[in-house]
């Protein structure tokens, strides 16, 4: 069971809603993934229409929505987007995203921390997307963020856990849940993150652009479950030298 702020989750797989060929395919993939929370970019939603093609089916599905501030380039823009989301969707949960460079979509650490401090003061449950920076993640935690969401690799790159060494430090020192976000391109990447001790992963592109998104969503669900089970079971220590699984007993000499 995963607890973040005032919510508990059975699934440790969170999903995104972008890049799917259709809303129906998106919903089917989310259902197959077992995910209980999906992110939603406020910039993609027409809040003036109750039958918005993206928002309406998501609300009807019962999955918890995590609006994000994608598109914001400054703390002020992110705070405004969060306030808009709270007013329109009736949620105080927000995924904080501030990436000023559209080419790389890397999070701005200074603006992210500034926005996080303001949003926490306004009563938001803040889940910040951030670089795999252990110092920044600790500062965000100290600012009152309910979780931290460090990247594994650039958004949509499918490169996997390129920041593994830093993620290990973040996980080791965190007192709030760590959700690995961005760059996860294969079920094996998700399993690796959970085996390391990450509390959850957020996956969008790898599912949405797969040849069969529904089957890929199922694969990610199974990978996350396997990774968490492996972590809880206790992985064996990695060693440099070979260690025999069947110690010598001298029986060969005894037969001579």
From Swiss-Prot:
Reactions this protein catalyses: [ThiS sulfur-carrier protein]-C-terminal-Gly-aminoethanethioate + 2-iminoacetate + 1-deoxy-D-xylulose 5-phosphate = [ThiS sulfur-carrier protein]-C-terminal Gly-Gly + 2-[(2R,5Z)-2-carboxy-4-methylthiazol-5(2H)-ylidene]ethyl phosphate + 2 H2O + H(+)
Keywords (A to Z) from UniProt: Cytoplasm, Schiff base, Thiamine biosynthesis, Transferase
Active site, per annotation: 95 (schiff-base intermediate with dxp)
Gene Ontology molecular function: any one: thiazole synthase activity
Compartment list: Cytoplasm
A Gene Ontology term for the protein's cellular component: cytoplasm
InterPro entries xrefs: Aldolase_TIM, Thiazole_synthase_ThiG, ThiG
Annotated residues for binding of 1-deoxy-D-xylulose 5-phosphate: 156, 182-183, 204-205
Top-tier EC class: transferase
Pathway: Cofactor biosynthesis; thiamine diphosphate biosynthesis
GO biological process: thiamine diphosphate biosynthetic process
EC nos: 2.8.1.10
Family to which the UniProt record says this protein belongs: Belongs to the ThiG family.
Role description: Catalyzes the rearrangement of 1-deoxy-D-xylulose 5-phosphate (DXP) to produce the thiazole phosphate moiety of thiamine. Sulfur is provided by the thiocarboxylate moiety of the carrier protein ThiS. In vitro, sulfur can be provided by H(2)S.
Record-linked HAMAP family: ThiG
Subunit record text: Homotetramer. Forms heterodimers with either ThiH or ThiS.
Name of protein: Thiazole synthase
Organism: Cronobacter sakazakii (strain ATCC BAA-894)
């Amino acid at each position: 069971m995963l607890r973040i702020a005032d919510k508990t989750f059975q699934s440790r797989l969170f999903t995104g809603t972008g890049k799917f060929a259709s809303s129906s395919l998106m919903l089917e993939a989310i259902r197959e993934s077992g995910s209980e929370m999906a992110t939603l970019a406020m910039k993609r939603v027409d809040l003036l229409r109750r039958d918005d093609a993206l928002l309406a089916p998501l609300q009807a599905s019962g999955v918890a929505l995590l609006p994000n501030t994608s598109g914001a380039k400054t703390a002020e823009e992110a705070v405004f987007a969060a306030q808009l989301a709270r007013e329109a969707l009736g949620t105080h949960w927000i995924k904080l995203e501030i990436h000023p460079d559209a080419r790389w979509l890397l999070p701005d650490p200074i603006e992210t921390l500034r926005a996080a401090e303001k949003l926490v003061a306004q009563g938001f449950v803040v889940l910040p997307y951030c670089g795999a920076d252990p110092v920044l993640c600790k500062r965000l935690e100290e600012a009152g963020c309910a979780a931290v969401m460090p990247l594994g690799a650039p958004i949509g790159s499918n490169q996997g856990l390129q920041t593994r060494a830093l993620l290990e430090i973040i996980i080791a020192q965190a007192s709030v849940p760590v959700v690995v976000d961005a760059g996860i391109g294969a079920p094996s990447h998700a399993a690796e993150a959970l085996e390391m001790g990450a509390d959850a992963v957020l996956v969008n592109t790898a599912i949405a652009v797969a040849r069969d998104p529904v089957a890929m969503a199922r694969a990610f669900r199974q990978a996350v479950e396997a990774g968490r089970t492996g972590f809880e079971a206790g992985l064996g220590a990695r060693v440099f030298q070979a260690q025999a699984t069947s110690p010598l007993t001298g029986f060969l000499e005894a037969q001579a």
